[in-house]
Amino acid sequence: MSTLPEHISLWGELADVDHELRHVDVGGVRTRVLRAGSGPDLILLHGTGGHLEAYARDIAGLAADFRVTAYDMVGHGWSDLPDKPYTIDVLSDHLLGLMDALDINSAHLSGESLGGWVTAWTAAHHSDRVERLVLNTPGNIADKPEVMVRMRESTLAAVRDPSDETVRRRVEFLFHHKEMVTDELVNLRRAVYGRPGFLQAITNTLVLQDPEVRKDFAWRPAWVGRVTAPTLLLWTDHDPTGGLDEAELLLGWLPDARLHVITDAGHWPQWEKPGEFLRAHRDFLVLGKDPV
């Protein structure tokens, strides 16, 4: 049986770790960035409607081995919300612009859900900028309509009415163990969803759940096969957005990939199983071996 996270607060996780939280100008987009640690660059990307605190339980541990950069993607968190569709190429360009602004020539990339989609696209189209790649529950590789509908409807319901009930339901969707969803995490997400202009911003993100828009960026072997970076697929046994059959698809498409399954977790293994998440990253990115 799972227990509540062993932390006082989101920021309590970073209480004894030197870090910097600031906004960076990325091509005119004011972008919220958190940085900690030293060593090889590792950039963390959150999912749809998310924010950098998705990695609150991981940054301190990762900072022991990496110069960690977590950020709010354009149209997310407390970054700017320009009114345009946030398609995968737009999100990838924002990532590359952030790397330029921070003088990061190349980096390891670890992306969760939508963030995984963005990192894979970036690795396929800008291979010189990516060292190694971690795709963390990238979700709905098979473009299942029911998953797209659920993602769109649950997210819009929470943003249109960011009450404790609707937002908690949206956050609980990410977890296998719902009891691990804290009031603080829900209230943080409510604050994001309540930002002026965020309803239009999330609508601009959810265009990716429209099959007609999605088809131009959908996971397909033609572009996935161009990813030359060694890749770790981090999957779970309770991810509501995609099962192990979808991991097998990517294993067949990616030239240099391996799979590690985190058990007893949902769509947010970095929160539900931070120790195993950290070990997998350290094994693959630092030691150059497959996680066990």
Regions found by a protein language model. Give the residues of each.
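Alpha/beta-hydrolase fold catalytic core
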Residues: 1-42, 65-66, 104-105, 282-292
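Conserved alpha/beta-hydrolase catalytic His-Asp/Glu region
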Residues: 146, 164-225
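Conserved HGGG/HGGXW glycine-rich cap/lid loop of the alpha/beta-hydrolase fold
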Residues: 25, 29-78
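Flexible "cap/lid" loop of the alpha/beta hydrolase fold
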Residues: 120-124, 131-167
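Acidic catalytic loop of the alpha/beta-hydrolase fold
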Residues: 238-242
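Short beta-strand/loop motif that positions the catalytic acidic residue
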Residues: 227, 233-235
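Catalytic active-site module of serine/aspartate enzymes centered on a nucleophile-bearing elbow/loop
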Residues: 256-292
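Active-site loop/oxyanion-hole signature of alpha/beta-hydrolase fold enzymes
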Residues: 34, 56-60, 69-114, 118, ...
